[in-house]
Amino acid sequence: MITSILLSLALMLFVGMYKTTFYEIKRAQNEIESRKSFWLAEGGVECAIAQYFPSQKLPASIQVCDDTLSVTTKLWLDGTSNDVIASAKSENQSVSRRFALATSELKSGAIQTSASIKIKSSLVINTPDPGIEVDEGWECAAFRFKGHLSVKGSLINYGLSDGPAPNEEFMSHKKCLQEHLTTVAGDCSSSSEPKCFANDFVQDDQLSVFEDFFGVPRHQHDVVRANGMFREINLETQTAEGLWERKDCGEEILQQLRQNNLHLWINGSCVISDDYLADIKALSEASDGITLLVHEGIFAMQGAASIKGVLFHFNQDFEPSIEQWQRLGMGDSIAAHFPEDQAVAAYYQDGSFMITGGAFFDYSNAEHLALFRDSLSFQYNHDVITHSSSSASSYLWKKGAWRDF
């Protein structure tokens, strides 16, 4: 009798354990199937994203990446937020991701650099960035810099009274505040005591030129380069024999501008000789403004240059050297005019320079230098800068939309 009772209890316990185990197995299988559906839906989202980037144009229809899988994929523009939404559904699992348009948050300043600038000869600001309007006038900004700035020669900021308007819609009759107008006869440096620059020259330790201009962090610059708006130029190519050949930067730029490709991303060191500067000037003035962005290399112009547009020099990892300037035939000129700076020079303007728009220099090392020999004249134009930054706008995934909380 006792044996029967014990056997019955053991059987009941076994059946209970079996049911529990079966339940756990079934639940695990369901969870796996659910996760498989979720992963398939995520794959569908990635399929849609691959068809949206790098052109950043919504396709008329989404091509099926794998017709053996039952995944429904959609890609559309949210009319309220202007976010691009990629979504996919597999069985009962739905996944969606949002991409928001990166916007420029550029600070005031006609010329901006995360490094340092040296100018020999005269500096004329025909039209500064108006900056912030207050009751008494405008807090105008000519230069914004992170490193140091020096001018050997005369310097004058004419303000807003005599030069062209900073944009087409600018109707204000107010002038730059007197404390935002610099006039210097002789040498002036950001380290001078007493202070020789007025408040139109702003030293900014938090300046991040690339991110401020494009709305994209420096380390994600490939998003901007591949956004479909820039025409990319690679100045060094490898032959079938394995040899490296260097293209003429000025010739490549002219070729693209003549094809109406106005926003150029130039990879490698670029020297634009005097032979091309007149044609570049004419083509830029016939447009709403061009963008010349030189990335990871030294940048130089030989001769008098005049450009309507945005000049952008962006070095993230590149380190300039005397040997590199020598290889490009510019070493002797830099050594003659800036003998103490040739090892850290990243940009060199060998002749007078005038720009209508803006100039931006973003270097990883604040000690790297942009050097200007001969006269430098700037006319800030907000419309030209906006044309450049908005043309290069890129979509980035929206924070919180990709498990990046």
What are these regions (language model features)?
Residues M1-W39, G43, I49-F405:
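Compositional signature of intrinsically disordered, low-complexity segments enriched in polar residues
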